[in-house]
């Protein structure tokens, strides 16, 4: 993949190597339930949506949305095709969800409908998808953030196949008010014969209007597409719309200008260069290495200079300079090494190995201009030596004899297969990856918004902890800041096999995860204790304790939405919205 390889810089001051564990607390958690007038518009997967990517994108979708500019405010779409808003003003007097917008068309007539989705690009702008392929840009009339503010359609257009809104931002650039939105869809791929038959499309749409034209019309300014083979864990647009950041299991590539062919990249050009004829060929036996190349036309033996050193070789041609020079893979016997010119102007250089029986992985370290010719007899000998390690038949019962491990003792973290997961930053102008971070040893955990004006944060597992990272596009030398740590949370979440949603408070005071049905687990940051505790094993006083709490809903309906504020958790089922009071208002 293109782009410079980077690494995430962990802030050691945010780590607690002395953290022991979470202590189960039986302190009650007040829970308030609000009955919904109409059920949530949950869209089940169809028979043709059978892949893991369909399940990740649509089957595990979070139907509860938050407005990060308005604390304790959540939104959802019900079966009457209404966008409903719910804001907590007083815990003891919960109101009812209020309709703020209604889709102008019947959504149930679309056979390929997806779930409706939304994202708040700013405090006054919302991007909304009806799940049938139409994108809406909504302006909230009341800038105070009241739920009674008027939602006004400023743009709506059918863009093609159904999609969901992943992220959006609002910015002013070049005297234009631009709303950038990221849309996700899964499309059939007829060329993918061996795979799932689908590919993932992330479309980056820019919609603009002149800033000084209050009554002007919003129009599509630009459309760009990213194609990949896996649903990204994280995807977001930079605040000024200069680039996109993404975490995905498999790489993505840009499709520019709505064409079906990607722009040629430097890597592809390099691949073409690598397909040119090699300058030389070489092969080896147990005793020596033989290098062969053609002498250019018009040159004689006197125009060729070959120097042998124990660990180096230098081949040069008159008037053309160095042909091959560098450090050999292993040392040679200079006195026994020689070269000759054979018929057809072929030069054959024989290098005698100082260590007979050794195998060279390359001729000159780092040189890519030659081609290694495999000796068939050597290949057969190696295959025969490895015969006892291979078989043409699958082992029907691998646990009957010398099992490599006890499968019952493995955790999810031990079975993590996405070793090629990467964090990438794509430049919006060049349509190329500029930064790449390999996350093979740091599994993705969850995404949330800590600061509304910035990009969403993401949490990764580092050893046993969960580390929170804030993308900062303005810092060219360090695009991701480590801003908080949840001790041992990476280890804890790996044990929750039934977990569905994962989030944390914007002020990092607690994290929470919910199962598919009923149970919610809350993990608080360490806080000072009112009474003195003493650790007898280590002989020291304990000044702070990290608490774990468990809440259980009264309903057995599946949980379809989950959001957190600094004071409350919002849990949505198909028929009820539950509000759990976690912290007192500061």
From Swiss-Prot:
Superkingdom of this protein's organism: Eukaryota
Subcellular location: Cytoplasm; Nucleus
Gene3D superfamilies: 2.60.40.790
Key words, A-Z: Cytoplasm, Nucleus
Gene: nudcd1
Domain CS: 275-364
Annotated segments matching region Disordered: 259-278
InterPro entries: CS_dom (IPR007052), HSP20-like_chaperone (IPR008978), NUDCD1 (IPR037895)
Gene Ontology annotations for the cellular component aspect, listed alphabetically: cytoplasm; nucleus
Chief subcellular location: cytoplasm
Organism field: Xenopus tropicalis
Name the UniProt record assigns to this protein: NudC domain-containing protein 1
PANTHER family cross-referenced by the UniProt entry: CHRONIC MYELOGENOUS LEUKEMIA TUMOR ANTIGEN 66, NUDC DOMAIN-CONTAINING PROTEIN 1
UniProt-listed Pfam families: CS
Record bears the keyword Magnesium: no
